[in-house]
């Protein structure tokens, strides 16, 4: 996991087995940005949701294939508006970090500051329209 802010992290694919550890570490919500069947062996959204709920985590599925749409960014913004410690994940964390950045910028955040925060976490958003 890579910190995008004090309460938001981006991550590559999370395993259902890892979610109880995240809950124990203080995470309260998981946002799954992977479409089902993106690659062989990937857990389905239903499997991740069941594990998240069993661990006491709030779960949101906002599948993103490619560049996040404004509607997907808005859904991510809604998932983050209550400042619950949240891990967003996709295959590499890139789509999740892009959706996070688009969500913040749509709500008035400075694009350069958001890009800098993503870069500090290891995500290059220089080509993402914010």
Q: Predicted segments — roles?
A:
Residues 1-87, 98-130:
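Cys-dependent protein tyrosine phosphatase-like superfamily
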């Amino acid at each position: 996991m890579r910190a995008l802010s004090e309460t938001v992290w981006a991550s590559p694919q999370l395993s259902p087995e890892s979610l109880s550890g995240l809950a124990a570490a203080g995470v309260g919500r998981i946002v799954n940005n992977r479409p089902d069947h993106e690659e062989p062996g990937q857990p389905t959204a239903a499997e991740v949701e069941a594990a998240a709920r069993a661990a006491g985590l709030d779960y949101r599925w906002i599948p993103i294939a490619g560049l996040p749409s404004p509607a997907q960014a808005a859904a991510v913004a809604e998932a983050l508006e209550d400042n619950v410690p949240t891990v967003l994940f996709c295959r590499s964390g890139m789509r999740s970090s892009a959706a996070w950045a688009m969500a913040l910028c749509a709500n008035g955040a400075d694009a350069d500051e958001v890009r800098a925060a993503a870069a500090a976490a290891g995500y290059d958003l220089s080509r993402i329209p914010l």
